[in-house]
């Protein structure tokens, strides 16, 4: 076999051998010397799924009562001043409003999934309302 000339090749810079003992010792002694422990973080989506299960199980109202009552009174002022509301009337309005919003968000989520996305966007809400016939 004929001999060929060897050309000098540049090193690819492989990983340098690490000193195992020094790093292990430092890792073990860090908490003892007052090292700050990192707070536990769940993987992205885990907490969201837990919240979905929690709120699907529950029946309590999700909008705070007093801010909703102020909003109702503010809107009613445009039609007639000095209106009075029974507490049961405000509760019924809130129940209906939350039921409407939950249904709208369910339809909005379906629109986002149909578009091969997991994030809902304003255009999904607009499409859901358009399909329902609420907005031309």
UniProtKB/Swiss-Prot annotation:
Instruction: Using the record's annotations, give every residue carrying the modification N6,N6,N6-trimethyllysine.
Output: 5, 10, 28, 37
Q: Report the domain of life of the source organism.
A: Eukaryota
- In-chain residues carrying the UniProt-annotated modification N6,N6-dimethyllysine: 5, 10, 28, 37
Location of site Recognition by ATXR5 and ATXR6? Answer: 32
- Site Required for interaction with TSK — annotated at 32
User: Which residues are recorded as modified (Phosphothreonine)?
Assistant: 12
Q: Which key words tag this protein in UniProt?
A: Acetylation, Chromosome, DNA-binding, Methylation, Nucleosome core, Nucleus, Phosphoprotein
Its recorded name reads: Histone H3.1
Q: In which tissues is it expressed?
A: Expressed in inflorescences, buds and seedlings.
Compartments, record wording = Nucleus; Chromosome
Matching entries from Pfam families are given as: Histone
Q: Which SMART domains match?
A: H3
* Species in which this protein is naturally found: Arabidopsis thaliana
| Gene for this chain | HTR2
Subunit structure of this chain's protein = The nucleosome is a histone octamer containing two molecules each of H2A, H2B, H3 and H4 assembled in one H3-H4 heterotetramer and two H2A-H2B heterodimers. The octamer wraps approximately 147 bp of DNA. The H3K9meK27me dimethylated N-terminal tail of histone H3 can directly interact with the chromodomains of CMT3 and/or LHP1. Interacts with ORTH2. Interacts (in absence of H3K27me) with TSK.
Top-level taxonomy: Eukaryota, Viridiplantae, Streptophyta, Embryophyta, Tracheophyta
What's the reported outcome of changing residue 29 to A?
Answer: Abolished methylation at K-28 (H3K27me) without affecting interaction with TSK
Chain's role: Core component of nucleosome. Nucleosomes wrap and compact DNA into chromatin, limiting DNA accessibility to the cellular machineries which require DNA as a template. Histones thereby play a central role in transcription regulation, DNA repair, DNA replication and chromosomal stability. DNA accessibility is regulated via a complex set of post-translational modifications of histones, also called histone code, and nucleosome remodeling.
What residues bear N6-acetyllysine in this entry?
10, 15, 19, 24
A Gene Ontology cellular component where this protein is annotated is: plastid
Record-listed N6-methyllysine modification sites: 5, 10, 19, 24, 28, 37
Q: Where is this site: Not N6-acetylated?
A: 28, 37
The molecular function GO annotations come to: DNA binding; protein heterodimerization activity; structural constituent of chromatin
Q: Which residues carry this modification: Phosphoserine?
A: 11, 29
> Its family?
Belongs to the histone H3 family.
InterPro entries tied to this protein: Histone-fold, Histone_H2A/H2B/H3, Histone_H3/CENP-A
- Main localization of the protein? nucleus
The segment annotated Disordered runs over 1-43
> How does the record describe the protein's post-translational processing?
Can be acetylated to form H3K9ac, H3K14ac, H3K18ac and H3K23ac. H3K9ac could compete with H3K9me and prevent gene silencing. H3K9acK14ac molecules are 30-fold less abundant than H3K9ac or H3K14ac. Very low level of H3K9meK14ac. H3K14 is specifically acetylated by HAG1 and deacetylated by HDA6. H3K9ac is deacetylated by HDT1. H3K9ac is restricted to euchromatin. H3K18ac, but not H3K9ac, is cell-cycle dependent and linked to replication. Reduced H4R3me2s increases H3K14ac in the FLC chromatin and activates or maintains its transcription.
